[in-house]
Amino acid sequence: MAKQKIRIRLKAYDHRIIDQSAEKIVETAKRSGAEVSGPIPLPTEKTVYTIIRAVHKYKDSREQFEQRTHKRLIDIVNPTPKTVDALMGLNLPSGVDIEIKL
């Protein structure tokens, strides 16, 4: 019999929110009787934007902005129907992107 697995990837700009969401998911899955591995921190994606401060000239004067995307991975092994129902009813913050693969 093959093991079933639910893989959950979380993405957010704020690392505190993503850690809280991951803890909620892990706690809910463990309470419903499933095995959980994670949250596993994945590499943080950093995007840097460089713009010229002045309107017309002064190309040497620039400003840089960065955007960091934090990612976490959670694997739920042998989920029960109770686990799936509990995860569907979970309330998570709006700043967290959730990607679920069965």
Curated annotation (Swiss-Prot):
Keywords from the named record: Ribonucleoprotein, Ribosomal protein
Record has Heme as a keyword: no
One Gene Ontology term, aspect cellular component: ribonucleoprotein complex
Subunit (UniProt): Part of the 30S ribosomal subunit.
Gene3D superfamilies for this protein: Ribosomal protein S10 domain (3.30.70.600)
PANTHER family (alphabetical): 30S RIBOSOMAL PROTEIN S10 FAMILY MEMBER (PTHR11700)
GN (gene name): rpsJ
Function in brief: Involved in the binding of tRNA to the ribosomes.
Family stated for the protein in its record: Belongs to the universal ribosomal protein uS10 family.
Matches recorded under PROSITE patterns: RIBOSOMAL_S10 (PS00361)
Name by which UniProt lists this protein: Small ribosomal subunit protein uS10
Any single GO BP term: translation
A GO MF term: structural constituent of ribosome
